[in-house]
Amino acid sequence: MISFIINRKRVSLDVDPSTPLLWVLRENLGLTGTKYGCGMAQCGACTVHLDGQAIRSCVASVSRAAGKEVTTIEGLSPDLSHPLQRAWLAEDVPQCGYCQSGQLMSAAVLLREKPRPSDEDIDQAMTGNICRCGTYPRIRKAIHRAAGMMSTGGAK
């Protein structure tokens, strides 16, 4: 049995401890917002938070989550009210949308660590997240917009 907190709820699962966290999230817990992209931690589509830090769930075994807190895109905000989600929509960031959950999860860590990031901070923090549609300029604008919303009390 592996126990951890997922999106503020404690779970205990009887799974092979070497199973990638991504597959436990998707197949055992039904949390399909986290995507499979490359399976090699190169694209960022599978990004989740483990004790507040962004990790690639496709290469992290579920045993790594034991006794810790995991947050997925579903836990960022269940009603799309997080400033990042609102900014993403306002800036028309999504095209195909496949990378978006990973992009949002990486951006959330960035804004927690640097509430007013520079363009360079954003580029550095988002380097491991690939967008096949090339929406990088809109992603940067959305992160700046969310930072502004959060600094003026628009955070949830």
Regions found by a protein language model. Give the residues of each.
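Signature of N-terminal electron-transfer/Fe-S-associated modules in redox systems
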Residues: 1-156
